[in-house]
């Protein structure tokens, strides 16, 4: 009926389709967060850096109308307020050159990255 090559190809295709849901499940995490700074949260002892944004570092200052403001603390505080008591869902997108997990994180189906850059 089927040639050996056809059976091998069918087997490989089947493996590929079976593997997709497992990988997608492994890339999602949810849990009580610890906010590190404006673009990084820790869930279950793992840091997740938000994709698509670069918030000020926690000790970073900025100037607004010649006044020094603590923009790193402001960014973190905005994130703390937005998350509140909600449990975020983070979907891993990649790992950067510094070996950090890059993820899109959501609260109530709203992107935290988009919220922070609005």
Task: Tell me what each language-model feature is.
Residues 2-118:
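Small beta-barrel nucleic-acid-binding modules, primarily SNase/OB-fold domains
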